[in-house]
């Protein structure tokens, strides 16, 4: 039955086949399964990125890997938009910055747009800006070039909007720049550029 579950992909979005999984404590997790076309253990790399991120002070939901079937691991991450079976309001940075596929087609979005949303509508502004900058530096360090606006998000708390825990942190060798510009014009994997903003 597991192969039937994995085969069609899912409605959870992203490039990898996924499913919601209930843990023994009734918490909801996302399972990211290996793909038939994988030539490396992507789950193991994502788990390594998770461990490095947490040790770098980046806030993330709990993650783990398990070998379920085949040659590669399955990556599990606890859903941060659920608590005691109830939804916590989450919105992507794509939505909260007022962007969509049409607006980003001709104008590459920037981390400065996320920072502007935090400054104008967020709570714990200094802490959230500091966390965002850590994520920029980390993405440069591991060449996470899949850092687009849908891979950043916000959670609505009783006090207001905060950055969600980081997610989908994966090293990549496919591109030579981030998906988001660091300033308004430049997306280079450059620590000095990040220091300048």
Which residues fall in each region the model found?
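Anionic ligand-binding catalytic core segments
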Residues: 1-149, 153-197
């Amino acid at each position: 039955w597991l192969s039937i579950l994995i085969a069609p992909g899912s409605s959870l979005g992203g490039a990898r086949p996924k499913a919601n999984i209930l843990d023994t404590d009734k918490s909801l997790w996302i399972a990211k399964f290996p793909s038939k076309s994988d030539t490396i253990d992507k789950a193991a790399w994502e788990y390594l990125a998770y461990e490095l991120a947490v040790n770098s002070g980046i806030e993330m939901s709990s993650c783990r890997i398990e070998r379920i079937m085949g040659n590669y691991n399955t990556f599990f991450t606890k859903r941060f938009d659920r608590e005691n079976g109830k939804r916590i309001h989450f919105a992507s940075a794509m939505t909260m910055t007022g962007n969509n596929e049409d607006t980003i087609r001709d104008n590459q979005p920037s981390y400065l747009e996320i920072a502007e949303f935090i400054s104008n509508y967020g709570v714990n502004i200094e802490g959230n800006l500091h966390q965002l900058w850590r994520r920029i530096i980390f993405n440069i360090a591991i060449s996470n070039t899949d850092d687009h606006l849908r891979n950043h998000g916000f959670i609505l708390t009783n006090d207001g909007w905060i950055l969600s825990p980081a997610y989908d942190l994966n090293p990549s060798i496919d591109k030579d720049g981030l998906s988001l510009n660091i300033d308004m014009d430049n997306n280079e994997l450059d620590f000095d550029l990040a220091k300048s903003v």
